[in-house]
Every structure is written in C-alpha cells, then in structure tokens.
Amino acid sequence: MDKKEGDQVHHDKTLLQDLSLPENVASEKRLPIDDVQCVNSPMLSPALDIEPKPNVVGTAERLPKVRCVVRARIPTVKGTEIFLHLYKNDFDNKEHLAIVFGQQIRSDSLDAVQEGETEMDRMVRGAYVGTLYPGRKSSYIDVNSSKTTEEQKEEARKTNFVPLVRIHSECYTGETAWSARCDCGEQLDEAARLISEEGNGVIIYLRQEGRGIGLSEKLKAYNLQDLGNDTVQANLLLQHPADGRSYAVATAMLMDLGQRDIRLLTNNPEKVNSIEGPNKEVRVVERISMIPKSWRGEKGIESAEVVLYLKTKIEKMGHLLDLPDS
C-alpha cells in the first residue's frame, strides 16, 4: 500500500469512528468520479417480456443494532405535532427516521443514560419528558406534567393499544418533485392523516430511494419506462432486482420504540412478512390496505402513468389491491 492509499484508509477509519459506524461500510476503495465506468447500462432492447428475478426483500438473518441519536418536536402545517426521531445503525450508513405521533411511544435507546452527559445534553438530544420551555433545568421533571419516562411507558403498555404503523421508503420524486408516476407522496400523506386521527402511531421513513437502487438509477429507470417498459422491466434492464429494499432496520427501530404488535398500512405482502423479523420480533396483527384516493372517489392523483405503476405492482409484485372497473 503506498502512502496515498494509506492516508485514504486512515481517513475512512477516522470518519467511521466519528460516526460510530462499522469499518466495512468504507472498506471499498473510492474512485475519482471520472474513473467510474457505467456498469449498469442496459444491454437488452426496451420493452422486452422479462420475468422478474427473485426480489431482495425478505426476512433478514439478523436484526441490525439501532440507536436513536436525537428526537425533536415538529409542529406540522396540518396542526398535528410529531416527534421526529433520527436513527443510526450498524447495517448501513444512512440516517433513517421514525415519525412518531403522540407522546406514548418512546425510544429505549434515546432514553438510556449516556456516560458523562448533563441534563442539558439530554434535553438537547430530545431525551426529556413532557415539553421543553425556556428555563427548564431537568430532563426528567416537567412542571406541566407529573409523569416520568417510565410512567409514560407503563401507561402506554396498560392501554393495550395496537398502533397504526406505516413503513415508508424515501421517494424524492413523489414527495418533493410532484411526480404523478407513483402514489408515494399520497400514501405518505394518507398514512399521516390516519395515524394523527388515532393520536398515536409511527411512520418509519427508510432512506431506500427507488426501491433501494438510488435516485440516479431510478431516473434512468424512468427513461426506460418512457421507452415502453414497466417499472419491473426497467429495474431488470438496469441489472437491479425488481425490489432491492430491506426492512430489517425498520423492525429494529420498531422494537426500540417498544412496538411489538402493530397494524400495518400496506398493500405489499412481502413487507408484512419481512417486517416481522427472523424470529417474529414484531407481530403484524392487522394489515390495512392503502387504496388510492381517486379509486375511492376522492380527489387524488389521476394519471395513466400511476395506473400503470399500480397495475404492475398488482400483476408482477403481488400487491393486494383490486384495480377499479373503469
């Protein structure tokens, strides 16, 4: 190893130590962007009749270790307050999120006492009970509430309330760029509406853009779709699985949030099986369908492309949803 390579390895290890992430995340040598060859260019003609390969989605052999590093209150434009929890894990180097509705659901890893931390440290990272206000001194004592963290958790356990949960993968195009190619943005909004009506629940927001292939590959897939392929064919032409996502991190996050029994908002049967974990650490007691708003006679996304997208999910990916008659 020459000096330059040695300096790069030292830099990678130092960065990973700062992030508290495993070294194998950065074990592969980085290449300058000009030296990277495009290895995923489609080698087949568009619009071929391709059978999907087995998906990567499935039950993990082990669950990753997760840790909630910060929690913050977010007032929303809908009037509902949520608590945004940011997680790190030993499976990937992404910052996954838990959008928590209500104050009954708490993170065990967040509430755990860290060596040497002060009361201010705990409040700054969100490990407090009740609400923050100017002049507050203790993370454990809120003058507006007499309940401790453990009392809040015990109260939640006694209610036997099974929360609504949505496992949602990031979709920049559908959530931010107003795309009518998919209904991801609508599903996220609808999940938030349903959970806020009940008062307590969780949206696990995974950074798995494009069913796990990333935004750049997803945009290539869009171009292949414009050439006549459906979403599954486009992924396969780019040498990706039809669905490359993993839900192991989501399972571990739910466990950290104390949610062992859930009602899952999904049309995807593979997600139901995967989220329960290798040893049934989480139990899906009910699956609740996510029916497009326009299919229910409400104002929602109306485009030929979103219909084809959903039709492909039903016919090629086994999603449990009935196409409308018209």
UniProtKB/Swiss-Prot annotation:
Keyword line: Cytoplasm, GTP-binding, Hydrolase, Nucleotide-binding, Nucleus, Riboflavin biosynthesis
Catalytic reaction equation(s) = GTP + 4 H2O = 2,5-diamino-6-hydroxy-4-(5-phosphoribosylamino)-pyrimidine + formate + 2 phosphate + 3 H(+)
> Record's family?
Belongs to the GTP cyclohydrolase II family.
Q: In which pathway does it act?
A: Cofactor biosynthesis; riboflavin biosynthesis; 5-amino-6-(D-ribitylamino)uracil from GTP
A single Gene Ontology biological process assigned to it is: riboflavin biosynthetic process
Gene name linked to the record: rib1
Q: PANTHER family from the entry?
A: GTP CYCLOHYDROLASE II-RELATED, GTP CYCLOHYDROLASE-2
Tell me one Pfam family matched here: GTP_cyclohydro2
Q: Where found in the cell?
A: Cytoplasm; Nucleus
Organism phylogeny: Eukaryota, Fungi, Dikarya, Ascomycota, Taphrinomycotina
Q: EC number(s) of the enzyme?
A: 3.5.4.25
Molecular function, one GO term: GTP cyclohydrolase II activity
One of the record's GO cellular component terms = nucleus
Extract the InterPro entries matched here: GTP_cyclohydro_II, RibA, RibA-like_sf
Query: To which species is this protein native?
Result: Schizosaccharomyces pombe (strain 972 / ATCC 24843) (Fission yeast)
Q: What is this protein called?
A: Probable GTP cyclohydrolase-2
- Recorded superkingdom: Eukaryota
